[in-house]
Design a protein with these regions (language model features):
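N-terminal donor/sugar-recognition subdomains of glycan-related enzymes
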Residues: 1-70, 78-84
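Short, glycine/acidic-enriched capping/hinge loops at junctions between secondary-structure elements
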Residues: 74, 81-86, 103-105
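Glycine-rich anion-binding loop/nest that anchors nucleotide
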Residues: 72-77, 177-180, 195-196
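Short active-site-proximal "capping" loops at secondary-structure junctions
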Residues: 77-78, 99
């Protein structure tokens, strides 16, 4: 599924992959593996079914598109920057480990992550914060391990699955962008957030 607001946001993935010499096939395998990992946990977490993930996406779309303001907290955000953002009106989308800089998470809509946010991502997942979880060629094992662990939480996080291939992957979306921060902005735009 492609839901990028502009095809160029998906095309950049091919450009970056090509510049680094990374194989597209690895990203395809990762996308399918991510969907499979979520499916294997459906017994423990029914909301991780395809319908459940679609409901999570619909809920996030409604929340984000109706928010007066949405701020993306970039991966390198400091605690001071996070404090300033958390004092503003509106919702916050955190890029991966930047969620650790947020002292108060009451306005945190979701975390966009490729599973390398460490303890901060784990903590947000344990709190039941929705995760826009991304599969790519070098995080297959890390994503499977994280989903397996998260499925055991008292309140597993709602999931939206994403990938970075130019073709569709049943059960996952491609909103565009390459880094967690890029993908957070692309996700916000795809959810109908006004870029102003």
């Amino acid at each position: 599924m492609h839901e990028a607001v502009d095809q160029r946001l998906v095309d950049i993935q091919d450009e970056v992959r090509g510049a680094f010499g990374w194989a597209l096939d690895e990203d395809r395998v990762a996308a399918k593996a991510l969907v499979q990992s979520a499916s294997e946990c459906v017994k423990a977490v029914p909301s991780w079914s395809e319908d459940g993930r679609r409901d999570t996406l619909d809920t996030l779309r409604i929340e984000l598109s109706s928010a007066e303001r949405v701020t993306v907290l970039g991966a390198a955000a400091t605690e001071q920057e996070a404090l300033r953002v958390s004092q503003q009106e509106g919702l916050i989308i955190a890029a991966d480990g930047s969620v650790g800089a947020l002292q108060v998470r009451s306005r945190l809509a979701c975390v966009v992550s490729d599973f390398d946010g460490g303890a901060h991502l784990h903590s947000a997942a344990e709190e039941g914060v929705p995760i826009v979880a991304h599969g790519h060629g070098d995080n297959i094992q890390r994503s499977a391990l994280a989903l397996s662990e998260w499925s055991q939480f008292d309140t597993p996080p709602p999931l939206v699955l994403t990938h970075q291939t130019p073709t569709s992957c049943h059960g996952a979306h491609n909103f565009g962008g390459f880094t967690d921060g890029d993908r957070a902005v692309c996700f916000a735009l795809a959810m109908g957030v006004d870029p102003q």
